[in-house]
C-alpha cells in the first residue's frame, strides 16, 4: 500500500500541474485574445481571467512545495519557508473560492428570472454586487491571514527552542490540524453562496419550464439552455469543492503513522485536483471556449498529420 502511494503521488502531482496549467492557461489566452479583438471585456470574462490566473498561481505553488519537500527536505522544514508557503497558499486559495462564488452570483443575476423587487435591484447592479462581495471577502482574508501568521510564528518559535525531530514533526502536525480547521471555516461562506445560487437557479429553471408548458410544451428555448449550462458549471464547482472540504477532514485523521501521512498526501492531491479539473468543465460548458478548444485540437491534429507525412 505504501509503495503504491509513493509511486502514484509523483504521477498525480505532475498530471495536476500539467493539466491545470494548460486548462487555466487556455482560458486566460482565449479571453485575452477576445479582449484585444473586441477592445472590451465583460465582467464574466474578467472574473474568469482572474480565476484562471489565481488557479495557475496556486497549482505552481503546490507543485513547487511538493518538489522542494522531495528534493530539499531540510529547506522545506525551515520555519520561514513553511510560513511563507502557508500564507501564500491561504491568500491564493481565498481568491479561488471567492472568485468562484462571485461567478456563481453573476450567473444567477444574469440568467435567473424573478419578479422580486430586491432581485431586480441587484440584477441591474450586478457589477456593484460583485465588487461589494469582493471587498467583504478582504476582511475574511485579513482575519484568516493574521490568525495563521500568529499560530505559525508560535509553533516555529517553539521549534527553535526545541530542535528534536519528534518535536518538529509534532509541530507540523499541529499546524496541519489547525489549518484543517481554519481554512474550511473561512472558505465555507463562499461555498454556501455557490450552493445557494445553484438552488435558486434550479428554482428559476423550474418556474420557467412550468410557464413554458402553457406556450410551447416540450420545446427547449434559449433561456432553458442557458439555465442548464450555468447549472452544469455551478454543480461541478459545488461537487469539486465538497471533495476539497472532505480532504481537510481526512488530513486530521491521517497524522498518526507514516502510512497515514502518505494517505494525507494522496487526499491532499485529490483535493487540489479541483483547480485542475474545473477549467475543463468551464471550457466544455461555454460555447466560445469549446469552439476555440476544438479549433486548437483540429489544428494540432493537422500539424502532426503533416509532420508524419
From Swiss-Prot:
- Kindly list every residue the record annotates as glycosylated: 162
Q: Which SUPFAM superfamilies match?
A: Family A G protein-coupled receptor-like (SSF81321)
Q: Which UniProt keywords apply?
A: G-protein coupled receptor, Glycoprotein, Membrane, Receptor, Sensory transduction, Taste, Transducer, Transmembrane, Transmembrane helix
**Organism domain of life:** Eukaryota
Question: Which Pfam family would be a valid example here?
Answer: TAS2R
GO molecular function of the protein, one example? G protein-coupled receptor activity
Q: Which residues lie on this side of the membrane: Extracellular?
A: 1-10, 77-80, 149-185, 251-262
Q: What InterPro entries would the database entry show? A: TAS2R
Instruction: Tell me where the transmembrane regions lie.
Output: 11-31, 56-76, 81-101, 128-148, 186-206, 230-250, 263-283
Q: According to its UniProt record, where is this protein mainly located?
A: membrane
One GO CC term of this entry?
membrane
Q: How does it sit in the membrane?
A: Multi-pass membrane protein
Q: What does the UniProt entry say about where the protein is found?
A: Membrane
Membrane topology (Cytoplasmic)? 32-55, 102-127, 207-229, 284-309
Q: Which family does it belong to?
A: Belongs to the G-protein coupled receptor T2R family.
Q: What does this protein do?
A: Putative taste receptor which may play a role in the perception of bitterness.
- Any further remarks? Several bitter taste receptors are expressed in a single taste receptor cell.
PANTHER family named in the record: TASTE RECEPTOR TYPE 2 (PTHR11394), TASTE RECEPTOR TYPE 2 MEMBER 113 (PTHR11394:SF42)
The protein's name: Taste receptor type 2 member 113
Say which species the protein is native to.
Mus musculus
Q: Print the organism lineage.
A: Eukaryota, Metazoa, Chordata, Craniata, Vertebrata
User: Its gene?
Assistant: Tas2r113
Amino acid at each position: 500500500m505504501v509503495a503504491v502511494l509513493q509511486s502514484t503521488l509523483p504521477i498525480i502531482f505532475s498530471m495536476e500541474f500539467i493539466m491545470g496549467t494548460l486548462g487555466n492557461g487556455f482560458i486566460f489566452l482565449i479571453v485575452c485574445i477576445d479582449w484585444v479583438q473586441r477592445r472590451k471585456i465583460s465582467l464574466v470574462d474578467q472574473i474568469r481571467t482572474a480565476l484562471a490566473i489565481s488557479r495557475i498561481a496556486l497549482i505552481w505553488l503546490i507543485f513547487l512545495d511538493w518538489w522542494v519537500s522531495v528534493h530539499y527536505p531540510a529547506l522545506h522544514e525551515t520555519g520561514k519557508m513553511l510560513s511563507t508557503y502557508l500564507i501564500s497558499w491561504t491568500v491564493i486559495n481565498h481568491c479561488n473560492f471567492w472568485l468562484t462564488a462571485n461567478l456563481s452570483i453573476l450567473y444567477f443575476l444574469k440568467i435567473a428570472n424573478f419578479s422580486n423587487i430586491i432581485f431586480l435591484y441587484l440584477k441591474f447592479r450586478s457589477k456593484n454586487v460583485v465588487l461589494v462581495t469582493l471587498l467583504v471577502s478582504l476582511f475574511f482574508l485579513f482575519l484568516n491571514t493574521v490568525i495563521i501568521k500568529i499560530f505559525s510564528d508560535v509553533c516555529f518559535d517553539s521549534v527553535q527552542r526545541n530542535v528534536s525531530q519528534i518535536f518538529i514533526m509534532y509541530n507540523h502536525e499541529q499546524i496541519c490540524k489547525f489549518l484543517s480547521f481554519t481554512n474550511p471555516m473561512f472558505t465555507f461562506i463562499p461555498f454556501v453562496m455557490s450552493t445557494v445560487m445553484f438552488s435558486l437557479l434550479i428554482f428559476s429553471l423550474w418556474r420557467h419550464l412550468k410557464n413554458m408548458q402553457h406556450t410551447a410544451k416540450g420545446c427547449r428555448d434559449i433561456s432553458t439552455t442557458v439555465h442548464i449550462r450555468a447549472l452544469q458549471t455551478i454543480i461541478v464547482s459545488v461537487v469539486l469543492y465538497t471533495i476539497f472540504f472532505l480532504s481537510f477532514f481526512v488530513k486530521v485523521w491521517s497524522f498518526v503513522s507514516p502510512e497515514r501521512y502518505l494517505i494525507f498526501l494522496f487526499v491532499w492531491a485529490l483535493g487540489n485536483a479541483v483547480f485542475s479539473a474545473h477549467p475543463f468543465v468551464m471550457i466544455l460548458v461555454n460555447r466560445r471556449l469549446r469552439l476555440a478548444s476544438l479549433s486548437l485540437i483540429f489544428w494540432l491534429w493537422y500539424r502532426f498529420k503533416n509532420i508524419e507525412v
